[in-house]
Design a protein with these regions (language model features):
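Short, glycine-/small- and polar/acidic-enriched structural segments
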Residues: 23-176, 180-183, 188, 192-194, ...
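Secondary-structure end/capping motifs
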Residues: 219-316
């Protein structure tokens, strides 16, 4: 009897230990293959004991709001939110840049529109407060059209596709696979610009990042470091096993493997027309933590210039009131830990 009680006690202790070891981290992403590495980290057990509670939330500003409210710890999203978070003091930090767009982002014009000049007075679809708006604004300015001369409508990708096909938007910015869907559905629609162009790829202006709440970084620093390592562990797995990795991502997002490969490619390498997925060492170079060179002419220590470009545009659009230094919105502590 005593042996049975002892065995029961050991089992209870082990169960308690297991429960404590499975520390939960709540994170979100929206439906896009570039964020799907979290599904690899979870399925392949690359999280160092973290239990990833992954939510798909299509509006990134909803995710940021949940982070500020303490209901999310981290999110993968586009890389322009740092200056807004710093200006509004919402308790969110950009931890690392994760990938530049290398052709997946496109500005598409409706049939019959062949120049930026024709967009004056027209509606263009973007995600306001997102990089799609900056990309559109840069292209308009470069082609002689001021942002005040068009009407921006704020739409997530699915809705932007509907707006273009339905004729309520004369132009829009899309990433894949949504851009190809529009081109297929609208004979005569044309691509006016994409993110393979030198000014966009060398600055890595269009790309993605990992954000964490300040409360998470400061209150659970070991978990923040583990989460960052988990992401890059998943990237390493995908680079070594792209076929299996893409299948896991497709399942997690409920995408076809073909749609995933349209963004990530099939061989774990840089995909022209898709994205360039940074490993942890490349991310460290871009974030200014280590010295080195990056492919495609991407600037080393490029996050500083990226911050300045996005800040300038957010001042123009009225999303921020102050031009703050990068250090107010970026915390590379978890990335430093992930390098060790």
């Amino acid at each position: 009897m005593r042996k049975i009680l002892t065995l029961v006690s050991i089992c209870l202790v082990m169960a308690s230990y297991t429960t404590k070891a499975a520390e939960t981290v709540r994170l979100s992403l929206f439906s896009w293959p570039g964020y799907g590495f979290w599904f690899i980290a979870k399925e392949k057990g690359l999280t160092e004991g973290l239990e990833l509670d992954i939510s798909i939330i299509e509006d990134p500003y909803q995710s940021f709001g949940l982070m500020t409210a303490g209901q999310l710890d981290a999110t993968s999203s586009t890389a322009e939110y740092g200056p807004i978070a710093a200006d509004k003091e919402v308790g969110i930090k950009l931890v690392t840049y994760t990938n530049p767009s290398y052709g997946t982002d496109k500005i598409i014009l409706a049939p019959g529109i062949i120049s930026a000049e024709q967009l004056k007075g027209e509606t263009v679809a973007v995600l306001e407060g997102g990089l799609t708006q900056i990309f559109m604004a840069e292209w308009l300015r470069d082609n002689g059209v001021d942002i005040s001369e068009v009407s921006f409508t704020n739409l997530i990708m699915d809705d932007a596709v509907g707006a273009m096909v339905g004729g309520t938007a004369a132009a829009a910015e899309f990433w894949e696979p949504f851009g190809s869907q529009v081109l297929e559905a609208m004979p005569g629609a044309t691509v006016a610009a994409d993110s393979t162009e030198e000014k966009y790829i060398q600055t890595a202006m269009l790309g993605d990042a990992l954000y964490m709440s300040t409360a998470f970084i400061e209150g659970r620093p070991e978990a923040a470091a583990k989460l960052t390592r988990a992401y890059f562990n998943a990237v390493d797995f995908w680079k070594a096993n792209p076929t299996e990795g893409n299948q896991i991502i497709a399942k997690g997002l409920n995408f076809s493997v073909a749609d995933v490969e349209q963004v990530l490619g099939a061989d774990g390498e840089i995909l022209k027309g898709g994205i360039f997925v940074f490993d942890r060492e490349q991310a460290a170079v871009f974030m200014g933590l280590t010295e080195g060179t990056l492919p495609l002419g991407i600037a080393s220590d490029g996050m500083k210039a990226h911050w300045d470009i996005t800040t300038d545009w957010w001042l123009k659009f009225g999303f921020v009131d102050r031009a703050l230094p990068m250090e107010t919105g970026v915390d590379t502590t978890p990335l430093r830990a992930a390098l060790q």
